Amino acid sequence: MTNIRKSHPLMKIVNNAFIDLPAPSNISSWWNFGSLLGICLIIQILTGLFLAMHYTSDTMTAFSSVTHICRDVNYGWIIRYMHANGASMFFICLFMHVGRGLYYGSYTFLETWNIGVILLFTVMATAFMGYVLPWGQMSFWGATVITNLLSAIPYIGTNLVEWIWGGFSVDKATLTRFFAFHFILPFIIAALAMVHLLFLHETGSNNPTGITSDMDKIPFHPYYTIKDILGVLLLILVLMTLVLFTPDLLGDPDNYTPANPLNTPPHIKPEWYFLFAYAILRSIPNKLGGVLALVLSILILIFMPLLHTSKQRSMMFRPLSQCLFWILVADLLTLTWIGGQPVEHPYIIIGQLASIMYFLLILVMMPVASMIENNLLKW
């Protein structure tokens, strides 16, 4: 008799995706982040659901409803801080996951990679709208500044911004629609993640060497389930350490002041995970140019398969490309730091140089390094 997990229509899908899935025998801990992102999404949906039960999306009561959650709701404070810091953990895992894809050439799985980039944009949109909901000073001004960027689009810009706002400024209509979108998007993300997995399982996983592993596969369970559980435990350890000891470490103190349209904070900045893109935006004096650079800083990922000039897939045996990859990581950390600094000397010039370096590395230096390495193979 066939095992029920292999014959039952529903369990068969789960079995083929998480139990009997043939996986390469040599994938490292860098392959843990996919499952960690799944766990992050589940944590965010669950904590978000419980927060939504007590939150009111009205400009008059939004801020006090968040205060009420923290003060009066049973364990409301832990749910709120798990949700806020869970977003940070989500982005840490996302950046590691994308970095792994760049390093090991996983972007050659075109469909999987493209869905992944769409997922990245969707998660960023969700996080941005979620940051607006507590209706603190940084929520309000962040929403005003970022939505206002769309006015740089020629001809339709102003109308587009007012359409998104639902009026002539960020107000009640904006908050209500942002709450609606923030609630629905995680479920769309979950659906997209399933499509992401569907495409991945068509080709099978990549591995650190970048060469086919068809002749050396092992079952996902128990080998990688146990490995993933270790990753999950470490993720929860870091998350709960943040939540229970320094819940406001990654937040902005300005967001503990209720939103006031008449008082602009001295330094408007987004959450830490958007700072690199914000630094690129600010480093270009022209508004439309800045917006284009901002979008391109993420959209450039779509073009990675086209920029791949190497004869090898992975960077494992390409020291020159490895060096440039880690310079790119350092450059992104520099941009993140600059994004949180005021617009004054010497931060302006550092930001501009780091922005130029970012695009140069991806568009010019890495493809050229790959070609040099191709020629070195002939020696």
Curated annotation (Swiss-Prot):
Binds 2 heme b groups non-covalently. GO terms for molecular function: metal ion binding; ubiquinol-cytochrome-c reductase activity. InterPro entries: Cyt_b/b6_C, Cyt_b/b6_C_sf, Cyt_b/b6_N, Cytb/b6-like_sf, Cytochrome_b, Cytochrome_b_C_euk/bac, Cytochrome_b_N_euk/bac, Di-haem_cyt_TM. GO terms for cellular component: mitochondrial inner membrane; respiratory chain complex III. Belongs to the cytochrome b family. The cytochrome bc1 complex contains 11 subunits: 3 respiratory subunits (MT-CYB, CYC1 and UQCRFS1), 2 core proteins (UQCRC1 and UQCRC2) and 6 low-molecular weight proteins (UQCRH/QCR6, UQCRB/QCR7, UQCRQ/QCR8, UQCR10/QCR9, UQCR11/QCR10 and a cleavage product of UQCRFS1). This cytochrome bc1 complex then forms a dimer. Heme 1 (or BL or b562) is low-potential and absorbs at about 562 nm, and heme 2 (or BH or b566) is high-potential and absorbs at about 566 nm. This is Cytochrome b. It comes from Moschus leucogaster. The lineage of its organism: Eukaryota, Metazoa, Chordata, Craniata, Vertebrata. The gene is MT-CYB.
